[in-house]
């Protein structure tokens, strides 16, 4: 292993007789974040929310949580999965540090979300450039346009949460509106944006789709 200037170590595979690293599949995500410039873009975007004496950058905390979710986590405490693999994921904040960071960012949620969205847009361009013919924009024409799928998806909340409401399916939770770019018949949808909405939001609310 050798350190990089980004958030995550550069990991190399060898055949040395050492213990295996759990959750190593997340390296695909951390490598993508570094190669596309997402990590430095996030760092610049959220630098204003970093306290002078802070050890863990807010952007690193958020990207760690994104990796945790991808590895199957469903709460902040599940970041322990990657915290135990410091050689693979670098220093990961404690549960208390993560909680304080999220609380601080949530206090200025509108600006934070705007900054994160800008960082993601900045990283998407090099990602699609590296994808070449597999990029969703490859071969797009007026007669073969890029398709963006808007989908309202119900997410169940198993306990009382902020903005969790009864849904039209007689459940309880959230009803975000998601935008995915189509990768064609052999690919999957790539999330472009998501509008967070309470569970009682409509599936075909015109104002939400326009926004």
Predicted regions and their residues:
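Dynamic "connector" segments at or just before major functional cores
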Residues: 1-202, 207-211
């Amino acid at each position: 292993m050798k350190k990089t200037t980004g958030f995550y170590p550069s990991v190399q595979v060898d055949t040395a007789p050492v213990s295996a690293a759990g959750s190593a599949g997340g390296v695909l995500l951390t490598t993508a974040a570094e190669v596309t410039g997402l990590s430095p873009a996030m760092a610049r975007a959220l630098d204003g929310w970093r306290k002078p004496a802070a050890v863990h950058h807010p952007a690193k905390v958020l990207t760690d949580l994104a990796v945790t979710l991808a590895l199957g986590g469903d709460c902040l405490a599940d970041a322990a999965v990657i915290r135990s693999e410091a050689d693979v994921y670098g220093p990961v904040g404690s549960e208390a540090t993560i909680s304080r960071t999220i609380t601080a960012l949530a206090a200025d949620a509108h600006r934070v979300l705007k900054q994160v969205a800008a960082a993601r847009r900045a990283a998407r361009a090099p990602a699609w450039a590296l994808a070449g013919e597999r990029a969703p924009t490859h071969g797009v024409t007026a007669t073969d346009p890029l398709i963006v799928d808007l989908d309202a998806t119900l997410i169940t909340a198993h306990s009382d949460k902020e903005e969790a409401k009864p849904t039209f399916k007689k459940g309880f939770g959230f009803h975000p509106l998601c935008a995915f770019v189509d990768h064609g018949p052999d690919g999957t949808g790539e999330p472009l944006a998501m509008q967070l909405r309470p569970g009682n939001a409509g599936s075909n609310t015109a104002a939400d789709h326009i926004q």
